[in-house]
Amino acid sequence: MSLTNKLSIKDLDLKNKRVFIRVDFNVPLDGTTITNNQRIVAALPSIKYAIDQGAKAVILASHLGRPNGQRVEKYSLKPVQAELSKLLGKPVTFLDDCVGPKVEEEVSKAKDGEVILLENLRFHPEEEGSHKDADGKKIKADPAKVEEFRKSLTSLADVYVNDAFGTAHRAHSSMVGIELPQRAAGFLVAKELEFFAKALEHPERPFLAILGGAKVSDKIQLIDNLLDKVNALIIGGGMAFTFKKTLENVKIGNSLFDEDGSKIVAGLVEKAKKNNVKLVFPVDYVTADKFSKDAKVGHATDAEGIPDGWQGLDCGPKSIEEFQKVIGESKTILWNGPPGVFEFDNFAKGTKAVLDACVKAVDNGATVIIGGGDTATVAKKYGAEDKLSHVSTGGGASLELLEGKTLPGVAALSEKK
Protein backbone atom coordinates (compact mmCIF):
# COMPACT_ATOMS: atom_id res chain seq x y z
CA MET A 1 0.00 0.00 0.00
CA SER A 2 1.59 3.26 -1.09
CA LEU A 3 1.05 6.09 1.38
CA THR A 4 1.33 8.82 -1.23
CA ASN A 5 -1.45 7.83 -3.59
CA LYS A 6 -4.44 8.52 -1.35
CA LEU A 7 -7.18 11.02 -2.12
CA SER A 8 -6.84 14.18 -0.03
CA ILE A 9 -9.42 16.76 1.04
CA LYS A 10 -7.88 19.16 -1.51
CA ASP A 11 -8.85 16.77 -4.33
CA LEU A 12 -12.56 17.02 -3.47
CA ASP A 13 -15.25 19.36 -4.70
CA LEU A 14 -17.01 20.27 -1.44
CA LYS A 15 -19.42 22.93 -2.70
CA ASN A 16 -22.96 22.29 -1.39
CA LYS A 17 -21.85 18.90 -0.05
CA ARG A 18 -22.41 17.43 3.38
CA VAL A 19 -18.90 16.63 4.57
CA PHE A 20 -18.39 13.97 7.25
CA ILE A 21 -15.06 14.45 9.03
CA ARG A 22 -13.83 11.75 11.41
CA VAL A 23 -11.78 13.86 13.83
CA ASP A 24 -9.82 13.00 16.95
CA PHE A 25 -11.37 14.99 19.80
CA ASN A 26 -10.18 12.50 22.43
CA VAL A 27 -9.15 15.38 24.70
CA PRO A 28 -8.17 15.22 28.38
CA LEU A 29 -10.99 16.42 30.64
CA ASP A 30 -11.13 17.48 34.25
CA GLY A 31 -14.86 17.10 34.90
CA THR A 32 -16.25 19.06 31.96
CA THR A 33 -13.18 21.29 31.56
CA ILE A 34 -10.84 20.55 28.65
CA THR A 35 -7.28 20.63 30.05
CA ASN A 36 -5.52 20.50 26.67
CA ASN A 37 -7.27 21.57 23.44
CA GLN A 38 -4.38 20.62 21.12
CA ARG A 39 -6.36 17.91 19.29
CA ILE A 40 -9.23 20.31 18.58
CA VAL A 41 -6.80 22.95 17.30
CA ALA A 42 -5.16 20.32 15.07
CA ALA A 43 -8.49 19.55 13.35
CA LEU A 44 -9.29 23.20 12.54
CA PRO A 45 -7.57 23.38 9.11
CA SER A 46 -9.74 20.61 7.63
CA ILE A 47 -12.93 21.97 9.22
CA LYS A 48 -12.26 25.55 8.07
CA TYR A 49 -11.29 24.37 4.59
CA ALA A 50 -14.64 22.56 4.19
CA ILE A 51 -16.52 25.68 5.34
CA ASP A 52 -14.47 27.96 3.05
CA GLN A 53 -15.10 25.67 0.07
CA GLY A 54 -18.85 26.17 0.49
CA ALA A 55 -19.81 22.89 2.15
CA LYS A 56 -23.51 22.66 2.96
CA ALA A 57 -22.75 21.10 6.35
CA VAL A 58 -19.70 19.81 8.21
CA ILE A 59 -20.47 16.78 10.37
CA LEU A 60 -17.84 15.97 12.99
CA ALA A 61 -17.56 12.56 14.63
CA SER A 62 -15.08 11.40 17.27
CA HIS A 63 -14.53 9.06 20.17
CA LEU A 64 -13.59 10.13 23.70
CA GLY A 65 -12.15 7.77 26.28
CA ARG A 66 -13.31 4.18 26.65
CA PRO A 67 -17.02 4.14 27.49
CA ASN A 68 -17.18 0.46 26.44
CA GLY A 69 -20.17 0.76 24.10
CA GLN A 70 -22.47 2.48 26.61
CA ARG A 71 -23.58 6.02 27.28
CA VAL A 72 -21.27 7.28 30.04
CA GLU A 73 -21.84 10.95 30.89
CA LYS A 74 -18.21 11.75 31.75
CA TYR A 75 -17.20 10.72 28.21
CA SER A 76 -19.68 13.03 26.48
CA LEU A 77 -18.27 15.26 23.73
CA LYS A 78 -20.59 18.08 24.86
CA PRO A 79 -17.71 20.08 26.47
CA VAL A 80 -16.01 20.21 23.05
CA GLN A 81 -18.93 22.20 21.58
CA ALA A 82 -18.10 25.49 23.35
CA GLU A 83 -14.34 25.15 22.82
CA LEU A 84 -14.73 24.40 19.11
CA SER A 85 -17.22 27.23 18.67
CA LYS A 86 -14.75 29.64 20.30
CA LEU A 87 -11.88 28.44 18.07
CA LEU A 88 -13.95 28.57 14.86
CA GLY A 89 -15.62 31.85 15.73
CA LYS A 90 -19.03 30.45 14.76
CA PRO A 91 -21.80 28.43 16.44
CA VAL A 92 -21.52 24.64 16.59
CA THR A 93 -24.61 22.44 16.86
CA PHE A 94 -24.25 19.50 19.26
CA LEU A 95 -26.41 16.39 18.79
CA ASP A 96 -26.77 13.98 21.69
CA ASP A 97 -26.26 10.87 19.55
CA CYS A 98 -24.31 9.98 16.41
CA VAL A 99 -26.79 7.73 14.57
CA GLY A 100 -30.53 7.14 14.28
CA PRO A 101 -33.56 8.88 12.74
CA LYS A 102 -33.35 11.99 14.95
CA VAL A 103 -29.72 12.63 14.03
CA GLU A 104 -30.39 11.91 10.36
CA GLU A 105 -33.27 14.39 10.35
CA GLU A 106 -31.25 17.16 12.08
CA VAL A 107 -28.33 16.72 9.69
CA SER A 108 -30.55 16.72 6.60
CA LYS A 109 -31.89 20.17 7.61
CA ALA A 110 -28.41 21.70 7.92
CA LYS A 111 -27.33 24.37 5.45
CA ASP A 112 -24.93 27.31 4.89
CA GLY A 113 -21.86 25.53 6.25
CA GLU A 114 -23.42 24.61 9.58
CA VAL A 115 -20.98 22.71 11.83
CA ILE A 116 -22.53 19.74 13.63
CA LEU A 117 -20.75 17.81 16.37
CA LEU A 118 -22.08 14.30 16.98
CA GLU A 119 -22.01 12.56 20.35
CA ASN A 120 -19.24 10.06 21.19
CA LEU A 121 -19.15 7.25 18.60
CA ARG A 122 -18.05 4.75 21.24
CA PHE A 123 -21.34 5.10 23.14
CA HIS A 124 -22.36 2.37 20.66
CA PRO A 125 -20.62 -1.04 20.74
CA GLU A 126 -21.02 -1.09 16.94
CA GLU A 127 -18.24 1.52 16.57
CA GLU A 128 -15.48 -0.72 17.94
CA GLY A 129 -17.31 -3.91 16.99
CA SER A 130 -17.32 -5.25 20.54
CA HIS A 131 -17.63 -4.38 24.22
CA LYS A 132 -16.44 -5.97 27.45
CA ASP A 133 -18.86 -7.60 29.90
CA ALA A 134 -18.67 -7.24 33.71
CA ASP A 135 -15.87 -9.84 33.88
CA GLY A 136 -13.84 -8.03 31.23
CA LYS A 137 -14.66 -10.63 28.56
CA LYS A 138 -14.95 -9.35 24.98
CA ILE A 139 -18.44 -9.66 23.51
CA LYS A 140 -18.69 -9.18 19.75
CA ALA A 141 -21.33 -6.77 18.46
CA ASP A 142 -24.19 -8.17 16.38
CA PRO A 143 -23.05 -7.94 12.71
CA ALA A 144 -26.52 -6.81 11.58
CA LYS A 145 -26.42 -3.94 14.08
CA VAL A 146 -22.90 -2.98 13.00
CA GLU A 147 -24.17 -2.86 9.43
CA GLU A 148 -27.12 -0.66 10.50
CA PHE A 149 -24.80 1.66 12.50
CA ARG A 150 -22.50 2.09 9.49
CA LYS A 151 -25.43 2.72 7.15
CA SER A 152 -26.77 5.44 9.45
CA LEU A 153 -23.36 7.18 9.60
CA THR A 154 -23.01 6.89 5.80
CA SER A 155 -26.45 8.44 5.25
CA LEU A 156 -25.38 11.65 7.00
CA ALA A 157 -23.03 12.85 4.26
CA ASP A 158 -21.96 13.03 0.62
CA VAL A 159 -18.19 12.80 1.14
CA TYR A 160 -16.01 11.33 3.87
CA VAL A 161 -12.80 12.82 5.27
CA ASN A 162 -10.59 11.04 7.79
CA ASP A 163 -8.51 13.35 9.95
CA ALA A 164 -7.98 11.00 12.92
CA PHE A 165 -4.54 9.49 12.39
CA GLY A 166 -4.31 8.35 16.01
CA THR A 167 -7.09 5.82 15.37
CA ALA A 168 -5.98 4.77 11.86
CA HIS A 169 -4.69 1.41 13.13
CA ARG A 170 -8.17 0.45 14.34
CA ALA A 171 -10.70 -1.12 11.95
CA HIS A 172 -13.57 0.73 13.65
CA SER A 173 -16.85 1.57 11.91
CA SER A 174 -16.13 5.30 11.55
CA MET A 175 -12.67 4.51 10.12
CA VAL A 176 -13.51 1.79 7.60
CA GLY A 177 -17.30 1.43 7.40
CA ILE A 178 -18.53 4.64 5.78
CA GLU A 179 -19.31 3.58 2.23
CA LEU A 180 -19.26 6.91 0.42
CA PRO A 181 -17.79 7.06 -3.11
CA GLN A 182 -15.09 9.53 -2.08
CA ARG A 183 -13.08 8.89 1.08
CA ALA A 184 -10.23 11.35 1.52
CA ALA A 185 -7.49 12.17 4.00
CA GLY A 186 -7.85 15.44 5.91
CA PHE A 187 -4.86 17.79 6.23
CA LEU A 188 -3.59 16.11 9.40
CA VAL A 189 -3.70 12.58 8.01
CA ALA A 190 -2.30 13.73 4.64
CA LYS A 191 0.69 15.30 6.42
CA GLU A 192 1.30 12.12 8.44
CA LEU A 193 1.21 10.00 5.28
CA GLU A 194 3.49 12.39 3.41
CA PHE A 195 6.20 12.29 6.09
CA PHE A 196 6.02 8.56 6.77
CA ALA A 197 6.20 7.95 3.00
CA LYS A 198 9.25 10.20 2.91
CA ALA A 199 10.97 7.98 5.47
CA LEU A 200 9.66 4.53 4.58
CA GLU A 201 9.26 4.71 0.81
CA HIS A 202 11.86 7.13 -0.53
CA PRO A 203 14.22 8.39 2.19
CA GLU A 204 17.10 10.71 1.46
CA ARG A 205 20.17 8.85 2.69
CA PRO A 206 21.94 8.28 5.02
CA PHE A 207 18.75 7.20 6.83
CA LEU A 208 18.98 6.81 10.62
CA ALA A 209 16.45 5.44 13.08
CA ILE A 210 16.77 6.17 16.81
CA LEU A 211 14.96 3.69 19.04
CA GLY A 212 14.42 3.74 22.78
CA GLY A 213 11.94 2.17 25.10
CA ALA A 214 12.19 -0.61 27.63
CA LYS A 215 11.72 -4.02 26.06
CA VAL A 216 13.32 -5.53 22.99
CA SER A 217 10.46 -8.01 22.64
CA ASP A 218 7.96 -5.12 22.20
CA LYS A 219 10.07 -3.69 19.39
CA ILE A 220 11.07 -6.85 17.47
CA GLN A 221 8.84 -6.14 14.49
CA LEU A 222 9.87 -2.51 14.46
CA ILE A 223 13.62 -3.27 14.50
CA ASP A 224 13.20 -6.07 11.98
CA ASN A 225 11.29 -3.86 9.51
CA LEU A 226 13.65 -0.89 9.92
CA LEU A 227 16.75 -3.07 9.34
CA ASP A 228 15.50 -3.45 5.74
CA LYS A 229 15.34 0.32 5.30
CA VAL A 230 17.90 2.26 7.34
CA ASN A 231 21.65 2.85 7.03
CA ALA A 232 22.17 3.24 10.77
CA LEU A 233 20.27 2.40 13.93
CA ILE A 234 20.82 3.89 17.39
CA ILE A 235 19.49 1.59 20.10
CA GLY A 236 19.12 3.39 23.43
CA GLY A 237 16.78 3.39 26.40
CA GLY A 238 16.21 0.38 28.61
CA MET A 239 16.35 -2.09 25.74
CA ALA A 240 20.01 -1.27 25.09
CA PHE A 241 20.95 -3.26 28.23
CA THR A 242 19.52 -6.47 26.80
CA PHE A 243 21.75 -6.04 23.73
CA LYS A 244 24.84 -5.05 25.76
CA LYS A 245 24.61 -7.94 28.19
CA THR A 246 23.82 -10.52 25.49
CA LEU A 247 26.40 -9.36 22.93
CA GLU A 248 29.29 -8.08 25.05
CA ASN A 249 28.54 -9.49 28.49
CA VAL A 250 28.56 -5.98 29.97
CA LYS A 251 27.63 -5.96 33.67
CA ILE A 252 24.26 -4.18 33.85
CA GLY A 253 23.52 -4.38 37.60
CA ASN A 254 19.79 -4.02 38.24
CA SER A 255 19.09 -2.41 34.85
CA LEU A 256 16.23 -3.71 32.72
CA PHE A 257 16.92 -7.08 31.12
CA ASP A 258 14.42 -8.65 28.74
CA GLU A 259 14.85 -12.44 28.89
CA ASP A 260 12.59 -13.11 25.86
CA GLY A 261 14.18 -10.31 23.89
CA SER A 262 17.69 -11.59 24.58
CA LYS A 263 16.98 -14.71 22.52
CA ILE A 264 16.52 -12.73 19.31
CA VAL A 265 19.37 -10.25 19.73
CA ALA A 266 21.85 -12.39 17.76
CA GLY A 267 19.41 -12.73 14.84
CA LEU A 268 18.82 -8.97 14.68
CA VAL A 269 22.55 -8.23 14.76
CA GLU A 270 23.09 -10.83 12.02
CA LYS A 271 20.45 -9.12 9.85
CA ALA A 272 22.06 -5.71 10.45
CA LYS A 273 25.43 -7.12 9.28
CA LYS A 274 23.87 -8.68 6.21
CA ASN A 275 22.13 -5.40 5.29
CA ASN A 276 25.19 -3.31 6.09
CA VAL A 277 23.34 -1.35 8.80
CA LYS A 278 25.55 0.34 11.37
CA LEU A 279 24.31 -0.42 14.92
CA VAL A 280 25.10 2.18 17.58
CA PHE A 281 24.74 1.40 21.30
CA PRO A 282 25.50 3.47 24.41
CA VAL A 283 28.96 2.90 25.90
CA ASP A 284 28.52 4.71 29.23
CA TYR A 285 25.63 5.35 31.60
CA VAL A 286 24.14 7.64 34.21
CA THR A 287 23.12 5.28 37.00
CA ALA A 288 20.75 5.37 39.97
CA ASP A 289 20.44 3.40 43.20
CA LYS A 290 16.66 3.21 42.66
CA PHE A 291 14.06 4.13 40.04
CA SER A 292 13.16 7.53 41.40
CA LYS A 293 13.64 11.21 40.64
CA ASP A 294 15.56 11.66 43.90
CA ALA A 295 17.79 8.60 43.47
CA LYS A 296 21.53 8.87 44.14
CA VAL A 297 23.29 9.49 40.83
CA GLY A 298 26.34 7.56 39.64
CA HIS A 299 28.27 6.95 36.40
CA ALA A 300 29.48 3.76 34.75
CA THR A 301 31.24 2.67 31.56
CA ASP A 302 31.11 -0.60 29.64
CA ALA A 303 34.54 -1.56 30.95
CA GLU A 304 33.68 -1.37 34.64
CA GLY A 305 29.97 -2.20 34.25
CA ILE A 306 27.07 -1.13 36.46
CA PRO A 307 27.40 -2.37 40.06
CA ASP A 308 24.77 -4.62 41.64
CA GLY A 309 21.95 -2.65 43.23
CA TRP A 310 22.34 0.16 40.66
CA GLN A 311 20.56 0.65 37.33
CA GLY A 312 21.24 2.67 34.21
CA LEU A 313 18.59 5.35 33.61
CA ASP A 314 20.34 7.45 30.95
CA CYS A 315 23.25 7.33 28.54
CA GLY A 316 26.51 9.05 29.53
CA PRO A 317 28.66 11.76 27.87
CA LYS A 318 30.64 9.40 25.57
CA SER A 319 27.42 7.85 24.23
CA ILE A 320 25.92 11.31 23.69
CA GLU A 321 28.98 12.30 21.65
CA GLU A 322 28.67 9.20 19.47
CA PHE A 323 24.89 9.67 19.00
CA GLN A 324 25.35 13.33 18.03
CA LYS A 325 27.98 12.37 15.44
CA VAL A 326 25.69 9.79 13.76
CA ILE A 327 22.73 12.21 13.84
CA GLY A 328 24.89 14.92 12.26
CA GLU A 329 25.82 12.61 9.37
CA SER A 330 22.21 11.66 8.53
CA LYS A 331 19.78 13.15 6.03
CA THR A 332 16.58 11.39 7.19
CA ILE A 333 16.05 10.67 10.89
CA LEU A 334 13.21 8.75 12.44
CA TRP A 335 13.04 8.89 16.24
CA ASN A 336 10.84 6.54 18.27
CA GLY A 337 11.59 6.21 21.97
CA PRO A 338 13.75 8.31 24.34
CA PRO A 339 17.29 7.15 25.29
CA GLY A 340 16.76 7.82 29.00
CA VAL A 341 14.19 8.39 31.73
CA PHE A 342 13.60 12.02 30.72
CA GLU A 343 10.75 12.38 33.24
CA PHE A 344 13.43 12.58 35.99
CA ASP A 345 15.63 15.69 35.58
CA ASN A 346 18.83 13.90 36.65
CA PHE A 347 18.35 11.37 33.86
CA ALA A 348 17.09 13.63 31.06
CA LYS A 349 20.45 14.80 29.69
CA GLY A 350 20.78 12.11 27.01
CA THR A 351 17.26 12.69 25.70
CA LYS A 352 17.73 16.47 25.62
CA ALA A 353 21.08 16.08 23.81
CA VAL A 354 19.52 13.83 21.15
CA LEU A 355 16.68 16.33 20.70
CA ASP A 356 19.14 19.23 20.35
CA ALA A 357 21.13 17.25 17.76
CA CYS A 358 17.91 16.54 15.84
CA VAL A 359 16.94 20.24 15.84
CA LYS A 360 20.43 21.09 14.57
CA ALA A 361 20.08 18.44 11.86
CA VAL A 362 16.84 20.07 10.65
CA ASP A 363 18.64 23.43 10.52
CA ASN A 364 21.23 21.74 8.31
CA GLY A 365 18.62 20.44 5.89
CA ALA A 366 17.80 16.97 7.27
CA THR A 367 14.26 15.62 7.71
CA VAL A 368 13.47 14.59 11.29
CA ILE A 369 10.30 12.66 12.07
CA ILE A 370 9.16 11.96 15.63
CA GLY A 371 7.02 8.84 15.89
CA GLY A 372 4.38 9.83 18.44
CA GLY A 373 4.04 8.56 22.01
CA ASP A 374 6.77 9.37 24.55
CA THR A 375 9.03 10.99 21.97
CA ALA A 376 6.29 13.47 21.04
CA THR A 377 6.07 14.27 24.77
CA VAL A 378 9.82 15.00 24.73
CA ALA A 379 9.43 17.46 21.84
CA LYS A 380 6.56 19.16 23.68
CA LYS A 381 8.38 19.28 27.04
CA TYR A 382 11.32 21.17 25.52
CA GLY A 383 9.22 23.33 23.18
CA ALA A 384 10.78 21.85 20.05
CA GLU A 385 7.66 20.73 18.17
CA ASP A 386 7.90 23.43 15.50
CA LYS A 387 11.69 23.00 15.16
CA LEU A 388 11.35 19.45 13.80
CA SER A 389 10.06 18.38 10.38
CA HIS A 390 7.15 16.36 11.73
CA VAL A 391 5.84 15.23 15.12
CA SER A 392 3.33 12.42 14.65
CA THR A 393 -0.01 12.61 16.46
CA GLY A 394 -0.49 8.84 16.48
CA GLY A 395 1.44 6.70 18.96
CA GLY A 396 0.01 3.27 18.12
CA ALA A 397 -0.75 4.14 14.49
CA SER A 398 2.76 5.41 13.73
CA LEU A 399 4.31 2.39 15.45
CA GLU A 400 2.29 0.00 13.30
CA LEU A 401 3.26 1.88 10.12
CA LEU A 402 6.92 1.66 11.13
CA GLU A 403 6.48 -2.06 11.76
CA GLY A 404 5.43 -2.40 8.13
CA LYS A 405 1.76 -3.04 8.83
CA THR A 406 -1.15 -1.74 6.75
CA LEU A 407 -3.36 0.69 8.67
CA PRO A 408 -7.07 -0.12 8.14
CA GLY A 409 -8.06 3.57 8.31
CA VAL A 410 -5.56 4.41 5.55
CA ALA A 411 -6.36 1.38 3.40
CA ALA A 412 -10.04 2.46 3.45
CA LEU A 413 -9.26 5.81 1.77
CA SER A 414 -9.89 6.19 -1.97
CA GLU A 415 -6.92 6.09 -4.34
CA LYS A 416 -6.19 9.15 -6.47
CA LYS A 417 -7.47 8.58 -9.99
Curated annotation (Swiss-Prot):
It holds the Pfam family PGK. Coiled coil: none annotated. PANTHER family: PHOSPHOGLYCERATE KINASE. This is Phosphoglycerate kinase. It comes from Yarrowia lipolytica (strain CLIB 122 / E 150). Belongs to the phosphoglycerate kinase family. The keyword Protein transport does not apply. CDP binds at residues 213, 218, 237, 337, 342. Gene3D superfamilies: Phosphoglycerate kinase, N-terminal domain (3.40.50.1260). SUPFAM superfamilies: Phosphoglycerate kinase.
